[in-house]
Amino acid sequence: MEIHHQLLVSLLFLLLPLCSSQENTRSLAIDVNGPVETSPISEKLNPKLVYEIKVHGFMLWAAMGVLMPIGIISIRLMSIKDQPIITLRRLFFLHVTSQMVAVILVTIGAVMSVINFNNSFSNHHQQLGIGLYVIVWFQALLGFLRPPREEKARRKWFVGHWILGTSIAILGIINIYTGLHAYAKKTSKSANLWTILFTAQLSCIALVYLFQDKWSYIQSQATFNRNQSVDHNSNISTAETGHGYEVEESKPELEKC
């Protein structure tokens, strides 16, 4: 009887590790198949997913952080007066091309997000991203439906196009910051360097944007100062020439004396 009791106790001790290992395995499976927020360890151990996140972020940065500002600045440069027609055409072509490439990159980034990432739309980055994607495509279609200048609808179209473009620029910048935060949260890697670099880039873009409004004034002032200096030099040369004539006219009188 005691032997049977000892065998039963030994079997219990042998079965306990097996039960605990099965429980750990099942908990790991639940963690892997669970939401992204509750299992960051599985994502950190997946280099392919980290690479896809980086590609997604780079494409959206190129679209919203580079091409969209280029399109805005190029179209604003067209408002400078007295520009050659060829310059205006090049600026308009730059505006259209940059915006079309930006729309393509946004679309590819959105498709990558749907296919590769867990899109539960439970965080601000995903929610803002889907809304931004819809606005970007609506703005692109609105750009192709531009009415002629002589039509009355052109003014309403311009106001709507400007409002949508400004909204896309602001929301795109915000979504880049939220994307950097989401990247740091998912991969447990610091995104402070990228945040600082993007902030510095935004500061440079803002300076260029504010400076271009004053560029025409600076050019007009430079032209005015140059004309003034030319007039001043011509007046001095005229005065010196007149003074030379007076000296030569006074020479015969001095010789008579």
Curated annotation (Swiss-Prot):
GO CC annotation, single: membrane
Region (Disordered): 235-257
Cell compartment(s), UniProt: Membrane
Record's keyword terms, sorted: Electron transport, Heme, Iron, Membrane, Metal-binding, Signal, Transmembrane, Transmembrane helix, Transport
Chain ranges passing through the membrane: 55-75, 91-111, 125-145, 157-177, 191-211
Segment forming the signal sequence: 1-21
Protein's organism: Arabidopsis thaliana
Basic and acidic residues composition bias: residue spans: 243-257
Database matches in InterPro entries: CYB561D1/2, Cyt_b561/ferric_Rdtase_TM
Membrane topology: Multi-pass membrane protein
Primary subcellular site in the record, as a coarse category: membrane
Ranges of residues in domain Cytochrome b561: 22-219
Lyase in keyword set: no
UniProt KW Electron transport keyword: yes
Gene Ontology molecular-function annotations: metal ion binding; transmembrane monodehydroascorbate reductase activity
Cofactor field: heme b
Pfam families: Cytochrom_B561
Comment on bound cofactor: Binds 2 heme b groups non-covalently.
Residues that hold heme b 2 according to the record: H95, H161
Protein name: Cytochrome b561 domain-containing protein At2g30890
